[in-house]
Amino acid sequence: MKMERKNVWHHRKKEEIEAFSKEYMEFMSKAKTERMTVKEIKRILDESGFVPLEDFAGDPMNMTVYAVNRGKAIAAFRVVDDLKRGLNLVVAHIDSPRLDFKPNPLIEDEQIALFKTHYYGGIKKYHWLSIPLEIHGVLFKNDGTEIEIHIGDKPEDPVFTIPDLLPHLDKEDAKISEKFKGENLMLIAGTIPLSGEEKEAVKTNVLKILNEMYGITEEDFVSGEIEVVPAFSPREVGMDRSLIGAYGQDDRICAYTALRALLSANPEKSIGVIFFDKEEIGSDGNTGAKARFYLKALRQILKMQGAKDSEFVLDEVLENTSVISGDVCAAVNPPYKDVHDLHNAPKLGYGVALVKYTGARGKYSTNDAHAEFVARVRKVLNEQGVIWQVATLGKVDQGGGGTIAKFFAERGSDVIDMGPALLGMHSPFEISSKADLFETYVAYRSLMEKL
């Protein structure tokens, strides 16, 4: 009669969990930005026999294809039947909160060269002070040449940091929003002046080093996207090594588990994954979930299958499609558990979390999954022996947030949010449970096969 929570560690083989976790940590060590994540996912797809959609020339009822959108988003499909029957999709985002270089970032102040940044997504600014940082990104020179920049991820590389104010001089009592200002999030770039240079000699020396390394000039930053991320490798956490600490688990943990599910599932209908950029800032732009790139890919497949009016048929496809919006949620953190309704809050190690709705206040700006669809999902999870739990985003009126679920619901699909719970979400070192990681993979695979 009563609904009881189950601890995953009591029901799964530890060896399975550990093997999956090791591969996940290897993935996370390479997937530090959305561009790097797309490259790694594309590499895995290529090795698994997937081909770019535009290069496919076989049976359109039996396709393993992918489409990349501007190097920042990617969709992959395993088509096994008439697409008009719809698909079972898992969608997620691969951008994470971070710092971005400003268009003209390099300055000198008090003989210290600094990189100016603008934070991206919802961060606590003080998290980013006095920790080692690395930079990754691309610059496009005036002639269109692409230059990749990676500094800080190799043992021999220098790292960067934003030094905090020492406590001895930090006696002023102020609100956090006033004390930690976004404009002050500047990385130390160097302190050695260039010999013979009178004005901004330290800045000029940094530019000289960058020019020697990459052949770039100061103006090239204008057409660049340089991202600042923590210089932390994924690590096992706890005496029992049951947890994983890493940057960017929101939401690359869902992307990885969905990708693995796509590759290992034995589906009865077509399945796919779509990984988006820009979720952390509202899913805007042509690489976010509001964009239409994946719809174009579906239209192309429909045309290959002989659809006469792919636009009309696409509506039918989307209405027949079931979508799992893969996103993380907030696990109960013992010192701060008063922000949760504990009866509806997820715990680490108790399986994948089923989130019927997100939003804020009176369920504003959310997809509230229909009861009929929740029942279908629950049935599959229970029949396949998946360990799951219920989750909401804190107490009513405590705060709120959103996912990409609503954008798929707006196009006619049934959607529900589902993913593992994290501690320290949006921090530079987020914590997940190895058990929940594995159970999320099992859940996504089961739903791809049976939903």
From Swiss-Prot:
Binding site for Zn(2+): H93, H168, H426
GO BP term, pick one: proteolysis
GO molecular function, one term: aminopeptidase activity
Keyword set, alphabetical order: Aminopeptidase, Hydrolase, Metal-binding, Metalloprotease, Protease, Zinc
InterPro entries registered for this protein in UniProt: M18_aminopeptidase_1, Peptidase_M18, Peptidase_M18_dom2
EC assignment: 3.4.11.-
Top-level taxon in the UniProt lineage: Bacteria
Any one GO cellular component localisation term in the record: cytoplasm
Cofactor(s) the protein requires to work: Zn(2+)
Aminoacyl-tRNA synthetase in keyword set: no
Keyword match Zinc: yes
SUPFAM superfamilies assigned to the protein according to its UniProt record, in alphabetical order: Aminopeptidase/glucanase lid domain, Zn-dependent exopeptidases
Enzyme class per UniProt: hydrolase
Pfam families in UniProt: Peptidase_M18
Protein family per UniProt: Belongs to the peptidase M18 family.
Protein name, entry field: Probable M18 family aminopeptidase 1
Originating species: Thermotoga maritima (strain ATCC 43589 / DSM 3109 / JCM 10099 / NBRC 100826 / MSB8)
